[in-house]
């Protein structure tokens, strides 16, 4: 600093304004001197404060230690001012016995219920639990669990309260089956003996007597694992099971039922959906008889898309030397959760090497990808999902098959493309099936004589065997009751049209089709698919279905509307606009029968022209045999 001032002084001496700069220099030196002195002063004060603080703390620790040491014997050496604390076996020191800060009174943890969409599986379960309680003349208060006591059990994860709730229970009789394929039963509350508990039992059937292990408690029900079956339900047919992972995997919950029983169970699922979410329609008897569920031509080997996945350990853990589990969610066996965790994987994934619901070529692809993953899993920093999508090629009999297959298909250990040849007898063509793993690759499906191209990662129905049945059912129900040629359905609006499946397959029955889809890529594929199939009366629009009818100019009395929304169902604004448009017929296709029931009641009871329509039919279609899933088609017509 002083060298800087000397240089400045030399510079000032050789300038014309010597006096001015000398005065400025002196002022600067004074200012810097004052600042330096103040810094030194506060540094010294800080050191003194620290020394006094640590001396005081050490003094307190020292005397506190002497006091504690006398508590087990004589109190003669305790200072008089502190003697009363020893006599009363209490300490008035602001520090604890160990010299640490006084521990605060622990705060009680409160259970926070998560917000659940009412038509989601968790939301539907609430209705099913209430239905069970009603049938058993029980109130919700009589099955309410003390979740707070479990949350605040500080002894250990296996504390006395947890052990009382999470225990083995023998000879439990299953009373009902849920829409998710789980059994429902009642057991005694182990803590509040005057109460009962509703228990969910995976793979339990009405009439089963089983032994279970409760492992998780919710306010109004508990979850359990099925340990063994003591007495079998008349419905249970274990001889029908083909999946070696049954009872462990969440993929095929109903495999131990006859197919007729599966179809009837799914019909009841649709009935209960309208019972829970359309109670006014039930009370006013506005629902038609529920038709039998339409069977799938294939009950096994039908899925054209599967998505096995895996998890990797957190970064803090050491690198894996063994490949983590690659497969699907496990269900019903707690030891499997432990086994997978022991090798560093995620406790909810079951390692599988085949899927009985997937097509033959997808199982070949799964074998190929598992072998590839065995070599490359160390390159992954986190878990991922592997796409396996079937691709169809219409073969030219005059050319070798391998020359007609896409280069990006899954390959075996020899580097050859894995494929399966099948014959379409109805259309008199031969098809080659390959497995695609790139979500951006364009794949082809062949449905009801039409060819559809779309990105492998985009949505498309996964059971091609039942698709021609569904498209024909929709096509046959487009026409409103005949009231003369002027009232004939001439136009079709396909909301949520995707890549154009229902638009193109229904195009022959009407003069004009308008499809709308929020995805520009899907609309692009829909336009290309219409052109490739020689369909000229289809027009596709990019936009939200909620604003669809702003651009529709076809007369409503001659127009039918197809709805095929995602699982969450339709927006209320869209349903109001649909009612204002007042079409001649509405065909509502849904992969979530619960949101469908909710939407249908809202449309009929809450919208402007809803009362001008009535339900003509409700029918289920079994897109996913051996599972609890069912799709429903509700047809409404203008009166």
Curated annotation (Swiss-Prot):
Variant or mutagenesis effect after changing residue 498 to D: Unable to methylate tRNA
Residues covered by the TRAM domain: 163-228
Keyword Methyltransferase carried by entry: yes
Keywords: Methyltransferase, Phosphoprotein, S-adenosyl-L-methionine, Transferase, tRNA processing
Active site per the UniProt annotation: 591, 631
Catalyzed reaction equations: uridine(54) in tRNA + S-adenosyl-L-methionine = 5-methyluridine(54) in tRNA + S-adenosyl-L-homocysteine + H(+)
Region (Disordered): 78-113
EC number: 2.1.1.35
Example GO biological process: tRNA modification
Residue numbers binding S-adenosyl-L-methionine: 461, 496, 517, 564
Location of Phosphoserine modifications: 92-93
Statement: the UniProt record of this protein carries the keyword Transferase: yes
Molecular function via GO: double-stranded DNA 5'-3' DNA exonuclease activity; single-stranded DNA endodeoxyribonuclease activity; tRNA (uracil(54)-C5)-methyltransferase activity, S-adenosyl methionine-dependent
InterPro entries in UniProt: MeTrfase_TrmA_AS (IPR030390), MeTrfase_TrmA_CS (IPR030391), NA-bd_OB-fold (IPR012340), SAM-dependent_MTases_sf (IPR029063), TRAM_dom (IPR002792), tRNA_(uracil-5-)_MeTrfase (IPR025795), U5_MeTrfase_fam (IPR010280)
The family this protein is said to belong to: Belongs to the class I-like SAM-binding methyltransferase superfamily. RNA M5U methyltransferase family.
Protein name: tRNA (uracil(54)-C(5))-methyltransferase
Gene behind this protein: TRM2
